[in-house]
């Protein structure tokens, strides 16, 4: 249960941020919030302006690429999630020569929260290296059903899509 004058922060990749307060609250300090009062609780929601961020992707080869974000990309968001849709064995991400994230391919997009690297990414970008996936990989049986990979040319390494997903936030103070 929240105390009066408690500060609350909510985060979401959706532009409509929602929270439920129990017991019901009489007011919150932010005027942009909508409150739907129920008998025992309150539904609180904020609507944020959507942000679209297009990363610049430079391909060095099918296995190596670099991502840069536009100036001010981190403004008005809580975080930016880089979503990398690829097929391969493993992926590694580097900033200034230091590995900051890695991933074993599992059939879903690789997601990396970028906020903690914001300054370095804005200055130098982030570098990615993908390794080929071969037919004898022991974990192929664990990949999602229906995922069919073409090993007729040997290893598979394919970058399908890169997108930036903004994470929004709202901070408010409640009172009973």
Where are these regions (language model features)?
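Non-catalytic C-terminal accessory domains or segments of carbohydrate-active enzymes
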Residues: 1-176
């Amino acid at each position: 249960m929240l105390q009066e004058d408690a500060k609350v922060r909510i985060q979401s990749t959706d532009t409509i941020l929602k929270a439920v307060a129990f017991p019901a609250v009489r007011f919150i300090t932010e005027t942009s919030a909508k409150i739907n009062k129920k008998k025992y609780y309150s539904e609180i929601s904020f609507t944020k302006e959507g942000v679209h961020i297009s990363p610049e992707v430079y391909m060095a080869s099918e296995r190596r690429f670099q991502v840069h974000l536009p100036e001010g990309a981190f403004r008005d968001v809580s975080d930016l999630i880089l979503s990398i849709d690829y097929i391969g064995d493993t992926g590694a991400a580097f900033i200034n020569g230091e590995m900051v994230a890695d991933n074993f391919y599992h059939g879903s997009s690789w997601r990396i929260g970028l906020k903690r690297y914001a300054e370095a990414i804005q200055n130098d970008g982030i570098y990615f290296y993908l390794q080929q996936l071969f037919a004898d990989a022991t974990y192929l049986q664990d990949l999602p059903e229906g995922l069919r990979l073409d090993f007729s040319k040997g290893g598979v390494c394919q970058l399908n899509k890169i997108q930036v997903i903004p994470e929004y936030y709202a901070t408010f103070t409640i009172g009973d």
